[in-house]
Regions:
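Alpha-helical transmembrane bundle and helix-membrane interface signal
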Residues: 148-149, 228
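Long, amphipathic alpha-helical stalk/connector segments used for oligomerization, subunit docking
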Residues: 297-299, 303
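Membrane-interface helix termini and inter-helical loops of multi-pass transporters
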Residues: 43, 115-118, 258-261, 329-333
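Cytosolic juxtamembrane amphipathic/interface segments immediately preceding
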Residues: 1-12
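Hydrophobic cores of alpha-helical transmembrane segments in multi-pass integral membrane proteins
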Residues: 11-39, 43-113, 124-145, 157-182, ...
Length: 471
């Protein structure tokens, strides 16, 4: 066994990524439909928008997103350290434990059991399970690095490792609650401190899970798929440390023009602006890795996913710092522009790099050279791309329109529009958003079929670890 890599747990998480992707995005499409046609709530409490939205966000971040990070980090750390995972049993525990977390979320959130904190809704017993699984994950990951046969720690592992450590810190500090019952707890913090800790957590969920984690994928799977070395290894190290040091400070930009002290808001804004540099450093490094291999984009849809994801990453990491500027935030905050920004990052960057990486993994986990159908991968790419563009464009227009309508005043100082008029004006954009989301979901369904056909009737191949020659 020690002569082989552990592909079993990688395959399990890869399948989970695809399945939960379909589920999480389906819930997203349902609530998008509810915003356009409210009757789809069916007057059933557990199908109401307020309960399904946290199910959607938890489903796509924790079920789809983190399952993808588990699969890729377990694969990359083995391949770059040339050693089997630290513990098969602990690795198996992280898989089943994480699925238990997801299933308990699917049960409790529609029942209305929530801590009421964005991305930290899950009640305290589930939060403790998350912490236990996460510690096991850290032991497996860092244990593998300690046992490595290659002296150098490849940069992708720095990103995965940074994400694992940061999430531990964030989850524990924001999870400090006083349980009242098994299903109800109260935050240890109150007022403005509670809000600040929540958005320190919330923004760094974006910064470390949805950014650092996926940059780990960029630095392994893009060079592998393109057959080219990383454009600048030095830049990869510099932008790793720059991201790590600046992201932690950016949280207050979620609380502009609130009761948060003004100096804290300004500090958050400054660090958000600084973040543009390391973010774009990473984006440029990834895209320049294609130097001399651009022709491959014509024939390789997996590479298309990866490169377009970097383009969306560049766009979202320009838009984010821009929206953190107070004057712009005064217009954008509380509008659907925020939703457009999130989904540029989530659908365009996180979704595409995950799909590209999983498409890279699946044939290797089935002992094949390619996916069952490359044409279907290409179809998925185009359907999803059109879906993302429709979604983001609709929400951008709606968001700016809402911001302008809310601040419009008559000469006598009264508001020009009632709130409900702005809601009515948004209706057509909600329909377009629903259409875009449906296309994106359709792409995910195509991926699920292709995954099934690729893995069907095939066992995990025995992947022998290369023997290093003693120098």
């Amino acid at each position: 066994l020690e002569q082989n890599y552990n592909y079993k747990v990688v395959k399990q998480f890869a399948i989970a990524t695809v399945l939960w992707g379909v589920v999480g995005m389906l819930v997203g499409v349902v609530i998008a439909a509810q915003l356009a046609w409210p009757a789809l709530n069916f007057d059933v409490p557990w199908l109401s928008y307020g309960r399904l939205r946290p199910l959607h966000t938890n489903g796509v971040i924790f079920a789809f997103g983190i399952s993808g990070l588990f699969a890729t980090s377990y694969y990359v750390v083995q391949r770059t350290c040339q050693v089997r995972l630290f513990s098969d049993r602990l690795a198996a525990f992280t898989f089943w434990g994480w699925q238990a977390v997801i299933v308990s979320a699917v049960v409790t959130l529609p029942m209305g059991l929530t801590r009421g904190k964005e991305y930290a809704e899950l009640e305290w017993p589930i939060a403790i399970l998350i912490a236990v699984v996460w510690i096991a994950y850290a032991v497996v990951f860092f244990g593998t690095i300690v046992r490595r046969k290659v002296q150098h720690i490849y940069v992708a592992n720095w990103f995965f490792g940074g994400y694992i450590l940061a999430v531990t810190l964030l989850h524990v500090v924001n999870g400090m609650v006083m349980p009242a019952t098994l299903t109800k707890s109260y935050s240890m913090y109150s007022g403005v401190q509670d809000a600040m800790i929540q958005w320190w957590y919330g923004h760094n969920a974006v910064g470390f899970i949805l950014t650092a984690g996926y940059l780990g994928m960029v630095y392994y799977f893009i060079p592998k798929q393109a057959g080219r070395p990383v454009y600048s290894y030095r830049l990869s190290i510099v932008h790793f440390w720059a991201l790590i040091f600046t992201y932690m400070w950016a949280g207050p930009h979620h609380l502009h023009y609130t009761a948060l002290p003004d100096w804290t808001q300004s500090l958050g804004m400054v660090f958000s602006l600084i973040l543009l540099a390391p973010s774009w450093g990473g984006m440029i490094n990834g895209i320049m890795t294609l130097s001399g291999a651009w022709h491959k984009l014509r024939t390789d849809p997996i590479l298309k996913f990866m490169i377009v994801s970097l383009s969306f990453y560049g766009m979202a990491t320009f838009e984010g710092p821009m929206m953190s500027i107070k004057a712009i935030n005064a217009l954008s905050h509380y509008t659907d522009w925020g939703i457009a920004h999130v989904h540029g990052g989530a659908l365009g960057w996180v979704g595409f790099i995950t799909m590209g990486s999983i498409y890279y993994l699946l044939p290797r986990l089935a002992g094949r050279t390619n996916m069952y159908s490359t044409q279907l991968v290409d179809l998925h790419f185009w359907v999803a791309t059109i879906g993302v563009v429709l979604y983001i464009a609709a929400m951008w227009i709606a968001g700016v329109m809402q911001g302008l309508m809310w601040r419009a005043v008559n000469p006598d100082g009264t508001l020009t529009y009632t709130f409900v008029e702005s809601v009515k004006a948004t209706y057509p954009y909600y329909v377009v958003r629903f259409a875009g989301g449906t296309l994106y979901l359709a792409g995910m369904a195509i991926m699920a079929y292709n995954t099934w056909m690729t893995l069907r009737g095939r066992d995990v191949p025995a992947a022998t670890i290369p023997q290093l020659k003693a120098a």
